[in-house]
Amino acid sequence: MAAAALPAPQPGLDPGSDEAGGDAELLELTSFAHVDEYLALQREFIQAATSVDAPDHIQAETQQKLQQLEKDINVYQEQSYLLDPYLEALVSPPARTLQQLVRTASTELDPTSSALAALCRLLYVYSKVRGYKIVSRFLPHEVGDLLPALVLLERVRQSGSRVSWEVPYVLLLWLGIVCLVPFSLKGGTHDEQVASRIELVARSYLPSSGKARDGAAVLLGRLYRREEVAGSAFPAFLTWARGRMRESGSQFERTGILQTLCEMVKNGETHFVQQHLDSVAGVLHDAVQFAQGRNTLVDRFRTKLAGRLALRLLPTQAPAAVDDRVDAFVEELLQALQHQVRIDITSA
């Protein structure tokens, strides 16, 4: 059996020396080596990235530091749990710096700012290595962040392709965390407008071909879980989603819709999901009817959605009879597995 690949040697360690072998290799597999040096480099990077009117050579050095940070942290891609004891020290400094930047200049900050792009790039790298769900826990989650982050995201959206793709992705994840904070979004016209603005800008990223679509699905899934938003906004989303499934020529948009529903069905309150289950199943039906076999990513998420819907219908105690809809979703899963087998056979 082939041996598992070991992390690349750390700077300052001669691969040919005695210290680079044996127990040192085992240590690299069981701890975050050179953490102090890494955190020192991160501090230098943040300071350089946020320098006002930095000359070209400082900006070049900032990029070099970012590339080195990314190279060093990518070593732990396959054993990312080793980073867990240090995640707060890793994620909080760039996240807090981003928070300060956005809070003080959300209406004036250039969406193409090199500082904004650099900070979001580093946060994306951490989410890639350790997973967005875990890294998101260390993003600021204060009510005061909602409006500044939303304003900046709207300006980023208006700027289009000139903005680094990591920027909208991180802002969408950040807003998704803020949406989980227990504060009221009902009662005032202003609050209702904020909720509508969040939904509108997040929906606009669902047809994206990149990570922004993933961030948008997470944000919408969490927004629709809020009691004051779910009652009217989620049914309207389902109606819109069925129309887009039938009419949209974009497989990316279909994927984004299914991703959003997967988030909602997995994490929403059981009674709420069951209340809208038939409508969600209608979207799934349209996904099968209009997209089956045309896109692997669409197939993946419709299969995931069918599985989650079936789980939501399973009773907590042994029933006298099983809901017929469970059989329908299980049949959909079996068909998807059969379809996957055909794909594997023909591509072998």
What are these regions (language model features)?
Residues 2, 7-64, 209-313, 322:
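Elongated scaffolding segments in large macromolecular assemblies
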Residues 44-63, 93-116, 152-164, 200-210, ...:
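Helix-loop junctions that connect tandem helical modules in alpha-solenoid scaffolds
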Residues 71-86, 99-107, 122-141, 155-159, ...:
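Flexible helix-coil junctions and inter-repeat linker/turn elements that act as hinges
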